[in-house]
């Protein structure tokens, strides 16, 4: 049947991007377009719930915002989940963010989802699902302790 992790992103404890993992495979990631009219500081929490059936180790995450590398910290690791966090400062009206475990160009074109977040109008949209089934939860009601950003 193949390996399938679960991958979610929590943004500022208010927005959840759910099911960003591929339908099958050991890779996870997405492309975000964030629109903002002023400076914003976003705290992102990346939650990976691994499928241990065919792997021994979870791949790390790489994050780029407008082609600049973003520091990602592993903050928690259990058998059930791995949590990374990053802080992104939005200075431009439009910010492109790439989040991935494998940066193969083909994955961004045809597999990883593409999501648009308009912070001005509070309109959030999945632009392209590709090889995943993402959805956006806003406002976020954390149903697991590790989803809370306190």
Swiss-Prot record:
Induction: Expressed in the early phase of the viral replicative cycle. Pfam families: Pox_C7_F8A. The keyword Cell wall biogenesis/degradation does not apply. Keywords: Early protein, Host-virus interaction, Inhibition of host innate immune response by virus, Viral immunoevasion. GO terms for biological process: symbiont-mediated suppression of host innate immune response; viral process. Inhibits antiviral activity induced by type I interferons. Does not block signal transduction of IFN, but is important to counteract the host antiviral state induced by a pre-treatment with IFN. Belongs to the orthopoxvirus OPG027 family. This is Interferon antagonist OPG027. It comes from Monkeypox virus.
